[in-house]
């Protein structure tokens, strides 16, 4: 079994969960384990080498839906894609969607995922009304913002470590349709990025940018923003491509990085200005290429995603970009975004107010030295790293970024363990 970063492929005992009534008995006889949905965590949050994975994709039932309020009760293995496909034609949709539709409800809660609209809608956990949690000792806990709120805060963003999420009640929202009015604006440096962010947040629901992190061009980028289109068009048929093989070496490396970034810049500059597009290619551009993670070759890749407080962001982001450009490493898919002012609901939720930078790095010998330099800059700025994307964060960096970790540990289920939990907490 492996995760999306393809950094390892190690043996696990995999137990398929298909009946929520039987979950308690399964957990009692197969611990320690960790829930595994679609495996879209990039690092080791969903892995337990030598131990058990409880695969939740069989817990895929919709239990109840209130058409008048948008309240949806479903099992934890339901995929966000399927909720969107079923309810969007009925005028409802999820308020928060991450960069891929291929995430389970349980995974979205456990990682408290965010989307391009964080500045207006917060994180996924902000729209969860209740969670049914199964502990490995047999206890079942129902928690929410107004019921056992302490357990809710520990479970949202809790990396699956407080118990197995069996089902959840979600609040959907009214949506006019699948079409978005979008605008792409080129910017020359970080000052322009911050100006565009501040200008966009009141009127544009979605806002994100691609930034060039290569030497000589670091700081230029393309700012993309979107909101519901006034006129909703007809049917849309997306093209599904696939990456058929794993190349012998990463196609993203020091030789190709500069040309790929220049190509990306040139291709997307052709689309400056406003257009009407379907929400899927805007919100989930990489979903159009199945198995795109194979492009990084047999060694896989790391994603490094951090958030730093807004008051320190200008210097911190400039320092991070300079360190990356100076190293000769970098990313074709470097994403820069400003989060909103809302604090997230979970004790270990990532998306705090500030500015987030995310980059993919092919896994090569010596890359850890760059990560250590980036870690130092993030910690000095008062920031933190995103556990859902992480496979190597030192324990000290985790503790510095998540000051409520000690409080969270009181809610740990001792029968649940992952490679990440052992690396970052010792158990």
Q: What residue spans do the PLM features occupy?
A:
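Noncatalytic alpha-helical scaffold of FAD-dependent oxidoreductases
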Residues: 1-427
């Amino acid at each position: 079994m492996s995760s999306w970063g393809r950094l390892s492929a190690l043996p696990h005992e995999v137990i398929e969960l298909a009946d929520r009534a039987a979950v308690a008995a399964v957990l009692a006889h197969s611990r320690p384990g960790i829930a595994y949905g679609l495996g879209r965590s990039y690092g080791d949050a969903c892995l337990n080498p030598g131990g058990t994975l409880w695969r939740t994709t069989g817990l895929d039932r919709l239990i109840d839906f209130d058409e008048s309020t948008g309240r949806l009760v479903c099992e934890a293995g339901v995929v966000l894609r399927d909720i969107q496909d079923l309810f969007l034609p009925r005028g409802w949709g999820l308020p928060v969607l991450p960069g891929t539709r291929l995430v389970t409800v349980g995974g979205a809660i456990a990682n408290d995922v965010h989307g391009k609209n964080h500045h207006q809608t917060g994180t996924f956990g902000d729209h969860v009304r209740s969670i049914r949690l199964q502990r490995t000792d047999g206890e079942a806990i129902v928690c929410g913002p107004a019921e056992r709120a302490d357990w809710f805060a520990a479970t949202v963003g809790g990396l699956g470590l407080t118990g197995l999420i069996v089902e959840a009640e979600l609040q959907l929202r009214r949506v006019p349709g699948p079409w978005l009015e979008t605008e792409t604006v080129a910017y020359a440096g970080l000052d322009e990025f911050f100006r565009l962010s501040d200008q966009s947040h009141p009127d544009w629901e979605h806002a994100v940018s691609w930034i060039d992190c290569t030497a000589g061009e670091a700081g230029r980028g393309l700012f993309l923003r979107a909101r519901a289109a006034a006129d909703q068009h007809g049917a849309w048929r997306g093209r599904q491509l696939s990456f058929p093989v794993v190349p012998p070496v990463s196609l993203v490396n020091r030789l190709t990085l500069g040309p790929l970034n220049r190509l990306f810049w040139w291709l997307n500059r052709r689309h400056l200005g406003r257009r009407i597009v379907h929400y899927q290619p805007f919100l989930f551009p990489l979903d159009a290429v199945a198995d795109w993670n194979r492009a990084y070759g047999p060694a896989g890749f790391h994603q490094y995603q951090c958030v730093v407080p807004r008051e320190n962001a200008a210097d911190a982001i400039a320092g991070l970009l300079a360190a990356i450009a100076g190293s000769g490493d970098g990313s074709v898919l470097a994403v820069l975004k400003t989060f909103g002012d809302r604090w997230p609901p979970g004790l270990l939720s990532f998306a705090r107010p500030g500015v987030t930078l995310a980059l993919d790095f092919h896994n090569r010998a010596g890359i850890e030295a760059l990560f250590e330099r980036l870690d130092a800059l993030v910690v000095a700025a008062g920031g933190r790293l995103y556990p859902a994307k992480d496979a190597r964060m030192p324990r000290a960096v985790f503790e510095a970024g998540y000051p409520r970790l000690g409080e969270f540990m009181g809610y740990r289920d001792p029968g649940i363990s992952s490679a990440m939990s052992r690396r970052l907490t010792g158990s």
